Structures are given as structure tokens and as C-alpha cells.
Amino acid sequence: MEEDFFKLILITDRQNIPMEEYLDFVSACVQSGVTAVQLREKGLSHRELLSFGGALKSILDPLDIPLIVSDSVSVCLDLDASGVHLGQTDGDVIEARELLGPDKIIGWNVHTLDQLLNANTLPIDYLGLSALFATENKPEATDLWGFSGLEQAVSLCEHPIVAVGGIDESNAGNVVEAGAAGIAAIGAFHSAHNPGLATKALREIVDRGLRC
């Protein structure tokens, strides 16, 4: 697993897509430049998450691409996933680190500056800054970070920042140039007519921005 696994994260949103079709989609994205996959399926049971996660791991493990589980330490442990991405209401980060050990990835979502500052002392690997811009997947998000908020967050944060929310080819370069270590997205992948080509283009944009 590369240290910069958070460079380009695909967040899942399978909905009613048949499993084999969705796995083909994920495979195309991974082969074209996605550096990690985040399993985020709010409506699934623990058992269903294990089934879906196991199918994803069959694609990701041979390529050494990490699978990060949203919200659930127990699913992460049962899957032996690479890590977990926790929100503010998903439990205690210190307890999660004790359960997962030192080698699992822990991402921590923040929505406010106070949450970001509090995260500086937490045993996490990266911080998810959400939401950066308006997005259909989180219509309830009103306090958006924007570019100015991102730049302030980068100057104050002790952890790598992964920007989340409303990021696509039109703004991804500016996001990483502003200091984000990576981006995570749903729509930029799922709404693409050709997911493989869209991923390749997005990865090239991110790589250029990180070199600036």
C-alpha cells in the first residue's frame, strides 16, 4: 500500500446497480488511477456490507489498493479492511485505534474549524474535510469550506487533508494546489459516461496539482 493512498479516493454509491456491473465499474476506476476505495453504503446491514466489501477486496487486494470502510470499526475488523473512515458521531477515535491497532488506516471527518483543531492530537492518518463545495450527495451541508476554508485548514492541521464534496475535473487541480493531500468523490466517478477515462483525467489533474 502506497503512503499516498489518499490521493484519489473513490467513494462507493452502488444503489440498485447489479453487483457484477458495479464491480466492473470499480475495477475500471482502480485500473485508471484510483488509489483507494471507501465503502460507504448507508442502507446496508452488517452482513450485506461484509458481502459487498468482500467482493470489493477481491478486486482491490491483488492490486494493493486499500479498502476503507465508512463509519464501522466492526465491519472493518470483520473484513480485515485496510482501515476505517469515521464521522463525528461514529464513536471514539482513540478507542478505534486501540481496537484496530497501529497499522490500520483511520480517517476522521470534520465539518468545523473547532473539530479540525481538536483532531490535531488524535491518532488518525488523514482528515476528511467536508463538505468543500455543494454536492447532491450531501444536500444538508450548508457550511461549506470553499477554497479559503481549505487554505486555512491546511495551515492549521497536523494531518494530511482529503477534501470531500463537489470535486470534479473542473476544480480538482485547484483543490490540491491549495494544499489538499488528496480528494475523495462520488459523482465525479459515478456520473461519468466513461468511468475509466474520467478517472485517468482526474488522476492526471491531481498529480499535476500536487507537483505545483
UniProtKB/Swiss-Prot annotation:
GO MF assignments: magnesium ion binding; thiamine-phosphate diphosphorylase activity
Keyword set includes Protein transport: no
Record text on cofactor binding: Binds 1 Mg(2+) ion per subunit.
Cofactor names: Mg(2+)
List of residues binding 4-amino-2-methyl-5-(diphosphooxymethyl)pyrimidine: 38-42, 138
Enzyme class, spelled out: transferase
GO biological process: thiamine biosynthetic process; thiamine diphosphate biosynthetic process
Family, as annotated: Belongs to the thiamine-phosphate synthase family.
The name this protein goes by in its record: Thiamine-phosphate synthase
Organism of this sequence: Chlamydia caviae (strain ATCC VR-813 / DSM 19441 / 03DC25 / GPIC)
Gene name linked to the record: thiE
